């Protein structure tokens, strides 16, 4: 399931350029996306040292190049050199959308995208996140509903970064 989720994500047209996977965990969707799109410049952002070591090992074993590893909490990284550096920010299974927007949008440069991977609750979370998205310089664009084999539904919520995060 995680692999299929990641492939559906990787096939989206916004997945290009310089991407950050916030809360990279075991590498979904980041590593799978990098395999699918080797030209992607990928940063795997994960605060847990053991997970970062695993991600480094996995990428080395897979022969992946063009991957950076950031042992950072997203909310702290957004105040540092990572702020507004990415064409795309995404996260899977990290937080509810209002908090996820606060983690991801400050990392995206103006003109870039925030693409949130959510389950069936995506639309409900979007209603609660609209104000935060606007305050952070984002604009909601669309919700994409995807269907996995076996009947599971996934929701991708696309926001564009239209102004700098205050």
Report each predicted region and the residues it spans.
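A generic structural signal for residues located within well-ordered alpha-helices
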Residues: 1-4, 26-28, 50
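Conserved class I S-adenosyl-L-methionine
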Residues: 15-25
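Conserved AdoMet
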Residues: 1-14
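Hydrophobic side chains within alpha-helical segments
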Residues: 5-8, 24, 54
């Amino acid at each position: 399931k995680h692999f299929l989720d990641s492939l559906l994500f990787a096939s989206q047209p916004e997945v290009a350029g310089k991407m950050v996977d916030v809360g990279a965990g075991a590498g979904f969707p980041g590593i799978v996306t990098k395999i699918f799109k080797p030209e992607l410049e990928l940063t795997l952002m994960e605060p847990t040292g053991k997970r970062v070591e695993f991600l480094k090992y996995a990428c080395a074993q897979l022969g992946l190049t063009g991957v950076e590893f950031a042992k950072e909490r997203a909310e702290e990284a957004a105040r540092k050199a990572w702020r507004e550096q990415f064409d795309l920010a995404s996260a899977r299974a990290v937080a509810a959308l209002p908090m996820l927007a606060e983690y991801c949008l400050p990392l995206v440069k103006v003109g870039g995208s925030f693409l949130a991977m959510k389950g069936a609750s995506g639309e409900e979370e979007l209603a609660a996140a609209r104000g935060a998205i606007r305050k952070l310089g984002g604009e909601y664009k669309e919700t994409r509903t995807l269907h996995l084999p076996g009947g599971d539904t996934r929701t991708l919520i696309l926001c564009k970064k239209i102004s700098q995060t205050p």
